[in-house]
Regions:
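Long, charged/polar, soluble alpha-helical segments
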Residues: 18-191
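Sec-dependent bacterial lipoprotein signal peptides
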Residues: 1-16
Length: 191
């Protein structure tokens, strides 16, 4: 009799611990936070945090299936927190990439203007047109890369914008140096 009373107390205690409602509200909040993180670019910029949030929400659902609502609540709250962290991380990363792309575009634009100015100086110095043809071609290609970078920037693809702008800046700077080398001997010959 005593043993059955102890078993009955344990069963009542376990049933009492498992009673209550599943944390539906918290799980919905976690799901909403995950969707917000995805919309904010977390799949691309904060993959680790987003994956952690999705896994925590899956664990919460599993715990609800096992009627362990306390554990489900804990996982749901963790999922929501991780999703919010993923959103913030994605926003920060995008802002950093945007700033880098803006700097790269500025450098490319400066290099383009410098190359154009060097070309004009070479023309004024009466450097032969056939010699300048390659420089004109390089400047046109650089303009195309700068335009590609601007297009990528406008589409929000800041990594591609930075890459295209950096390539353009490097190539245009080399063209400007090449033109300087052509102008210097021509200037010495006139003296």
């Amino acid at each position: 009799m005593r043993q059955s009373l102890v078993v009955l107390c344990i069963v009542v205690a376990v049933a009492g611990a498992c009673s209550g409602d599943p944390p539906d509200k918290e799980m919905q909040q976690a799901q909403s936070a995950i969707e917000t993180a995805r919309a904010g670019g977390a799949e691309r910029f904060a993959t680790t945090e987003l994956k952690g949030a999705e896994e925590a929400l899956a664990h919460a659902r599993d715990a609800v299936g096992q009627r362990d609502y306390r554990l489900a609540l804990s996982f749901a709250l963790d999922a929501r927190e991780r999703a919010q962290s993923a959103t913030k991380e994605a926003i920060d990363r995008k802002a950093t990439l945007r700033e880098e792309a803006e700097r790269s575009l500025g450098s490319a634009q400066t290099a383009l203007l410098a190359a154009r100015n060097r070309l004009k100086a070479a023309e004024v110095s009466k450097v032969q047109a056939r010699i300048l043809a390659e420089s004109r071609s390089n400047i046109a290609a650089g303009e195309g890369r700068v335009q590609e970078a601007r297009t990528a920037f406008e589409q929000g693809n800041f990594e591609a914008a930075s890459a295209a702008a950096s390539q353009a800046a490097t190539a245009l700077a080399q063209t400007a140096r090449d033109l300087d080398a052509l102008v210097a001997p021509a200037a010495r010959r006139r003296r």
